[in-house]
Amino acid sequence: MSTRENIAGNIITVLDAVTSPIELKKITREPFDVDELTQQQYPAVFIQSGNEIRSDETMTSTTITRQAQADFILVGFVKGTDTNIDTKRNQLISTIESSLEADRTRGGYAKKTEIVEVSTDEGTLYPVGGIRVVVRVTYVYTAGTP
C-alpha cells in the first residue's frame, strides 16, 4: 500500500476511535447523499484525497526520494436545531482537529499534519450543518511508491 493510502487509512482509524466530546457515527472515504442519512448516522464525515504538491529531495542513480504535501478533504455533517446548529458544527470541527493533532506523524507515515482550512455551510443546509476541513500532510516517499 502507498504511503498516501496509509495516511488516509490512519485518518479514518483515528476518527473512528473518537468518543469524546462527540462520537462520529458514520466515517467513510466515499461521498454520500446527506438527505439519505438517518438521525442515528449524525455526525457523519467523508474523507477524500485532494491535491498534492511533490518535490524531489534526493536523487541517486537508482532512487529518487520525494517530499509530498497532500491535502485530505474532510466533509462533515451534523444535525441540530435553530438554537444549537452552530455549536454542533464547532464541536465537529474541534473533535476532528484535536483527534488528528494527537499524532501529527499519522502513525509514523508523515513528517507533519496541519489543519490548513476550515469552512462551514453558514446555515444554508439547515437543519443539517456542514463543515469542510482541509488537512495537509507532509510525507517523504521513494519515487514509484507514493
What is the predicted role of each segment?
Residues M1-Y42, F46-P146:
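Charged, amphipathic alpha-helical segments and their flanking helix caps
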